[in-house]
């Protein structure tokens, strides 16, 4: 990043943040190929890894440098005058390099906007669990929530036009259009599915950048409203940069609706409005009434359709009351429930019992999705009965036990924020018995014999760090489940959710 910053600071008045020349630098492709920059992408192209070399990079740069213009033929996808015979390999390398280059202006502006602020120093904000303490603190005071499926069916050409207001380099935008029109097998619209995106595996970084940019644009109305309201102040809003074009659209949007709905513009200054985005969904929670939430729903649908040309069906935004609705949120079922309590009040010789209900944010671990994940990974059948893992039978006994134990510790680590650990005990039972069945299958023995042989050794592998400390300290007095079933812990080192289906 220092090299990028040094380049962009060279004669900035003439460069105007031009990033296109960086495509002719070898280190860009090395960085793009570095797995350290692609840690979040689970699916990688092994065939591309085998073909990558600096010699091919130099050959590609030489070939690009000799071309005066880009020419593409939609009728002949195998050979392109610009890319040559190695269309697939070269195009993939250019596209991955382009994905790195186009992120540079955003990264530099983000760093400059956060200079001197505490937000940039707090790496713990990256943790998925960091959102749950916020929900615990805020949601217990709120009444309604908008459960929003972020509109995603947007034409890629609209993304290119929107990107113009961030990237001033016309050459880079022309190259982006070139790629989008070159490959007819790419979808012309970004269409994320329920839990994953239908992006090409070899070009995930590029399309993830486009999708994240699209989401940032579609939700930037909330940043504008928070900045315009004197009641709402947010440190995180400093990470979004002012854009004259966008704010011009917002001002026009407000003027249009002011003419007809002056009496309800106060909803923009709701001091109890909170917004959270996760994966392809978002949550907008408020202390207001259902009428207020219906107005928000109406404004969001019209804003996305009129100013981002995205068709958003009203059914994609659900209005729910927090007191009787559970949110399926990042592997937890989160809800706000009433916790009744009785208070005795005594005046002289008379005493009274006063009932008091306190709202409390509650999180539980849904057992059915977890069993479904274990079933996909072939640790159990569809009913949750443990089965052996034949593909691991060739490993050593210690490796088999370590793999099963590590999976449970990861699951327990992630779901440590639940007060009720019953679901985790069920998962531990499935994984322990699946481990025993795998070992018995390997040695052609019975499960009973292996459980009798391993005993405490197998048990210790399925202890988390907290359980190990508790077990060693209070081994003779209390059971582990009694001491740990009442605690809630949020870890600030979790940056991703492990998918058991991909754990082979």
From Swiss-Prot:
Any one cellular-component term (Gene Ontology): chloroplast
Keywords for the protein's UniProt record, in alphabetical order: Chloroplast, mRNA processing, Plastid, RNA-binding, tRNA processing
Alphabetized InterPro entries for the sequence: Domain_X, Maturase_MatK, Maturase_MatK_N
GO-annotated molecular function: RNA binding
Protein location: Plastid, Chloroplast
GO BP annotations listed: mRNA processing; RNA splicing; tRNA processing
Superkingdom of the source species: Eukaryota
Protein family (similarity comment): Belongs to the intron maturase 2 family. MatK subfamily.
Function statement: Usually encoded in the trnK tRNA gene intron. Probably assists in splicing its own and other chloroplast group II introns.
Name of the featured protein: Maturase K
Gene name per UniProt: matK
């Amino acid at each position: 990043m220092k090299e990028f910053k040094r380049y962009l600071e060279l004669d900035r008045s003439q460069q105007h943040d031009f990033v296109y020349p960086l495509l002719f630098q070898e280190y860009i492709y090395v960085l793009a190929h570095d797995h350290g920059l692609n840690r979040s992408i689970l699916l990688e192209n092994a065939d591309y890894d085998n073909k990558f070399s600096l010699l091919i990079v130099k050959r590609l740069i030489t070939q690009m440098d000799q071309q005066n213009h880009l020419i593409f033929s939609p009728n002949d996808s195998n050979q392109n005058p610009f890319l040559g015979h190695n269309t697939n390999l070269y195009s993939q390398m250019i596209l991955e390099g382009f994905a790195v280059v186009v992120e540079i202006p955003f990264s530099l502006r983000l760093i400059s906007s956060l200079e001197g602020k505490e937000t940039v120093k707090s790496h713990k904000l990256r943790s998925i669990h960091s959102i749950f303490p916020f929900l615990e603190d805020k949601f217990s005071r709120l009444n309604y929530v908008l459960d929003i499926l972020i509109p995603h069916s947007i034409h890629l050409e609209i993304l290119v036009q929107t990107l113009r207001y961030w990237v001033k380099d016309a050459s880079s935008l022309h190259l982006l259009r070139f790629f989008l029109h070159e490959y007819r097998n790419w979808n012309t619209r970004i269409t994320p599915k329920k839990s994953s995106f239908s992006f090409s595996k070899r070009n995930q970084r590029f399309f993830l950048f486009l999708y994240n940019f699209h989401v940032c644009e579609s939700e930037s109305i909330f940043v504008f409203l928070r900045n315009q309201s004197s009641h709402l102040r947010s440190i995180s809003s400093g990470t979004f940069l002012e854009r004259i074009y966008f704010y011009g659209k917002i001002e026009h949007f407000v003027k249009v609706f002011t003419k007809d709905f002056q009496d309800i513009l106060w909803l923009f200054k709701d001091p109890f409005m909170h917004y959270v985005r996760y994966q392809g969904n978002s949550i907008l929670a408020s202390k207001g009434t259902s009428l207020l939430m219906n107005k928000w729903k109406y404004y969001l649908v019209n804003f996305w359709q009129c100013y981002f040309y995205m068709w958003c069906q009203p059914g994609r935004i659900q209005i729910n009351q927090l007191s009787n609705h559970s949110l399926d949120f990042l592997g937890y079922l989160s809800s706000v429930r009433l916790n009744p309590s009785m208070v005795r009040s005594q005046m002289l010789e008379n005493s009274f019992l006063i009932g008091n209900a306190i709202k409390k944010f509650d999180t539980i671990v849904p057992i059915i999705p977890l069993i479904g994940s274990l079933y996909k990974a072939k640790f159990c059948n569809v009913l949750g009965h443990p089965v052996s893992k034949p593909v691991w039978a060739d490993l050593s006994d210690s490796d088999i036990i370590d793999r099963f134990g590590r999976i449970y510790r990861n699951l327990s680590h992630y779901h440590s924020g639940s007060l009720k650990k019953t679901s985790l005990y069920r998962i531990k039972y499935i994984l322990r018995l699946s481990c025993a069945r795998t070992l018995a299958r390997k040695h052609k023995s019975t499960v009973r014999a292996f459980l009798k042989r391993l005993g405490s050794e197998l048990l210790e592998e399925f202890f988390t760090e907290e359980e190990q400390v508790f077990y060693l300290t209070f081994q003779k007095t209390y059971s582990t489940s009694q001491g740990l079933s009442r605690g809630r812990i949020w870890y600030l080192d979790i940056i991703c959710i492990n998918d058991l289906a991909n754990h082979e």
